[in-house]
Amino acid sequence: MQPFRYHVFVCDQQKPEGAPSCGAGGGLAVIEALRREVAAQGLESQVQVTACGSLGLCESGPNAVVYPEGTWYSGLTLADAPELVEEHFRNGRPVARLQRRDVGEVCAEMAANRDKRLAAVRAREASGALPDDLNERIRAFRQSRVILTALELDLFSVIGEGGAAADIAARIHADPRATEMLLHALASLQLVAKRDGVFHNSPVAARYFTAGSPHNARPGLLHTASLWKTWSTLTECVRSGTCAIPQELGERSSDWTQAFIAAMHRNAAERAAPLVAAVGAQGVRRMLDVGGGSGAYSIAFAAANPELEAYILDLAAVVPLAQRHIEQAGVAGRVHTRIGDLRTDHLGEGYDLVLVSAICHMLDEKENAHLIGRCYGALAPGGRLTIQDFILDPDKCSPQSAALFSLNMLVGTRAGASYSEPEYTAWMHAAGFTAIRRVHMPGPAGLMIGTRAA
């Protein structure tokens, strides 16, 4: 393999609030600007720009080091990107005005920064102050709330190609002063940039948060915004043992349901190909997708096997949303929908594969045992049940994603939770399944697979 002509490492490490750092100085924005300029000049096969941790020159950042020659740069800005790419990366001439030439001075500055950092750590420990990482975890909700509020206001779409705070406030029907404060907070998170009083979306925000972008994640993230309200009841839920706002999916508003299904569709679309590869679609003629939501998994299985027919069972509020995705995928002749309640309605029979994805965490133990038993009855001999969910390890303390998601079910459902591998195994064994196994997958969810005896 041929290495890149230049490997450019740019620090974007964020230090505790108030401490000088490359992250606070705009390191991420510099990285994005360099990557854009490298692409614009057609040098992507010759230059690799990589984010890295501290280079030890925190008070002079953003800092970068360019290999193979080991050229150091400090105090970089967005405006420096075109010159760096043109002069250094294209023409091989380091930019003298930005270059750190005195090796002894650089080493002394690194040592001074290290000593200052260690002294600050010792002082904090002696004072009994919270460790920085713990303090940041406790306060992390502030960043989430800023982003979620911006998404609820569709602020990034309104910013578009750029706008002043007063104009943006008028378009979102909000207070000008408060809107400007929100924009400044977003700028501190490097999701927008402010230049000459005009706010612009960062490349990340433009890609994932704006209407018209093919990667727009806002519709699904509005479901995350709605979770803010339920998670705010966690203390009450822990005291009472159940959610404070009990509502089933069919009882929610249409806006909530659309946001929820949009979020589930985005997640499923990302996970569908790995799931199909892990389970296998060949030899499957009839598939049941229990609570299939948007239909993303059925669509993926149908695409992988032209002889497969899938049947999605879901609520009346969800089925029209699934039909829209099915029609867009061009598989309406082989992916069918049926309105029904997975808790009570007949599942059918003779299926080669039954998929239960993101369902078991909404149910209690008895409901899961009952559903898994009914899935066994719906399968043809030799057919397989695949459960995809947040699966806890036996001690229920890990993985972290499943442990936290269990609380999401506490605050959002009457009796849902994340369940452990031994619990799934026991339910499947009691139903009659054999060859039961857990399959670890990329991302937070895993699989439990069992076979009905031939």
Region annotations inferred by a language model:
Residues 5-25, 48-67:
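Local cysteine-cluster metal-coordination motifs and their immediate loop/turn environment
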Residues 26, 30, 77-80, 84, ...:
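General structural feature for long, well-ordered alpha-helical segments within catalytic domains
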Residues 71, 75-124:
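Fe-S ferredoxin-like electron-transfer domains
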Residues 27-49, 71, 75-90:
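Ferredoxin-type iron-sulfur electron-transfer modules in oxidoreductases and energy-metabolism complexes
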Residues 124-184, 188, 194, 281, ...:
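Alpha-helical subdomain
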Residues 16, 73, 314:
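Small/polar loops that bind or transfer phosphate-bearing groups
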Residues 66-68, 194-195:
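Structural motif
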Residues 124-164, 170-173, 177-285:
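Conserved Class I S-adenosyl-L-methionine-dependent methyltransferase catalytic core
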